[in-house]
């Protein structure tokens, strides 16, 4: 039902898009979206490190950071953590983490985050170390201080509604100006794995506002690309920097969407005969895997359809590994051996073709994206200087 509704929304977006005007490069809206997936966040971290390295090379600037080039960076679960790491400012008002720092972060802290709590009835992990390290790294920083627009999702189990943390929402909903560590823990608090997170903020009149949040994947089913595009669309309508964008047009969007890998095409498939013998617990685990795999595929399908309909397929790049096997399929296997395998998955993915119909590799496509991002940044800087 939810996927049908999403498709209809996008279908009417296409119908509403009548302008054939191509945006000037400096006025294109650039969007980065990062999926959820626990320790598998190592895979998009490898991709981000490569892209940031390319931007530094193209611009001959070792201090170039991803937040300098993207108008919107969105993520859910581990993707929300990556979003915070590359957009939260340090004391010099620069991202506190470079992309190359993310994989070492997983290696240092992953084994402690995914350390079995020993509880039979509660979540698999108590979440204490995760919250502690997020507090240490992100400090008291709040959403409004992010270096670019962010879109981090969570789900409130008390109101039964998604909660989207963005800078652009704060004027209307100041209670969303939460601390980044609270947001990061909340978006990563996957049911079964971590406890839900409770915290409070304040409304414009000073009243206490309560949150009871779980994993953002409950709201976006693991892939926040549609959410990130929605935030980018609103940004384009409200920000004077994008004055040439008169109506929704995906020719005017540049979207990079990073997955954390799936195994839907190669592993953990089932027959009707097998599934007929399952009990509730086995079905619960299988449904989670199936839902994540189906959602990732359908979101990519929807977005690809929209960009192709606007003859803008080169403006969208989905980087995803669909052949995970063995321990690399697990979101919580933080053993050193498995993390090394995930690094290899990311590095190998860069050499793979983007599609069966194109010889272009992900590495080549990311270099093309880096050049576009660099050119747009320079054009925008020149325009601002007049």
Swiss-Prot record:
Keywords, in A-Z order: Coiled coil, Glycoprotein, Hydrolase, Lipid degradation, Lipid metabolism, Plant defense, Signal, Storage protein, Vacuole
Motif (GXSXG): 75-79
Active site: 77 (nucleophile), 215 (proton acceptor)
Residues bearing carbohydrate: 115
Any one Gene Ontology cellular component term annotated for this protein: vacuole
Molecular functions (GO terms): monoacylglycerol lipase activity; nutrient reservoir activity; phospholipase activity
Location(s) in or outside the cell: Vacuole
Limits of the PNPLA domain: 32-229
Biological process annotations from GO: defense response; lipid catabolic process
Enzyme Commission code: 3.1.1.-
Signal peptide from the UniProt entry: 1-23
InterPro entries for the chain: Acyl_Trfase/lysoPLipase, PNPLA_dom
Keyword rRNA-binding belongs to the record: no
Highest rank taxon of the organism: Eukaryota
Tissue specificity of this protein: Tuber.
Broad enzyme group: hydrolase
Domain free text: The nitrogen atoms of the two glycine residues in the GGXR motif define the oxyanion hole, and stabilize the oxyanion that forms during the nucleophilic attack by the catalytic serine during substrate cleavage.
Function: Probable lipolytic acyl hydrolase (LAH), an activity which is thought to be involved in the response of tubers to pathogens.
Protein name: Patatin-15
